[in-house]
Amino acid sequence: MEPITKLTDTFWNEKGLREEALFQKQNALLFPTKKVTIRAVPMTERTPELTRMYKAFCEKYPYDFGIISCSYMYIDGGEDYPWHVDNVVGLKVSELPPVQCTINILVEGSETAVEFENFGEYVYKAAVFNTSIMHRITPKSDRIITRLSFREMCYKDVVRKVKTKINN
């Protein structure tokens, strides 16, 4: 199974997410790890557009996905995100279970290729992303990713549910 599954059916307002993410960037929380410092803004009452996107996802795909967290993630152009998996981190950043897979929506920046070990490079705008496979990226420009993090469901099961068309 490929490590990403591109999404073509949007449930988000890209312009609204971009504007909110840019405004919230100054409030990003910093999570230093051994390899890189993660910069993120989690979904709160100060992120109504992110909350709308999450609710739209839940309406479009009314399944039990378990715990999902949402955030904006910031990566500077040229910053090296070396080989890593998201479900094994050197730093506990929350009380939530580790991330099993994500939906990543690029709302700012170029569509730089993400490289997956043993799979090669993939370019995406929006995709279900298997974060349990070693991957890396060095973006050419600053990137902002809107991210839904699935804490209790594996990539294969999320893809299966997302591919099941409901409400179309």
Specify the residue positions occupied by each region the protein language model found:
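A short secondary-structure junction signal
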Residues: 82-86, 113-118, 138-139, 157-161
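A short hydrophobic beta-strand segment most commonly corresponding to one strand
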Residues: 101-106, 126-128, 141-160
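Conserved metal-binding segment of the jelly-roll/cupin
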Residues: 118-135, 140
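Non-heme Fe(II)/2-oxoglutarate
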Residues: 1-72, 80
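Short, solvent-exposed loop/turn segments at secondary-structure junctions
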Residues: 80, 88, 108-112, 127, ...
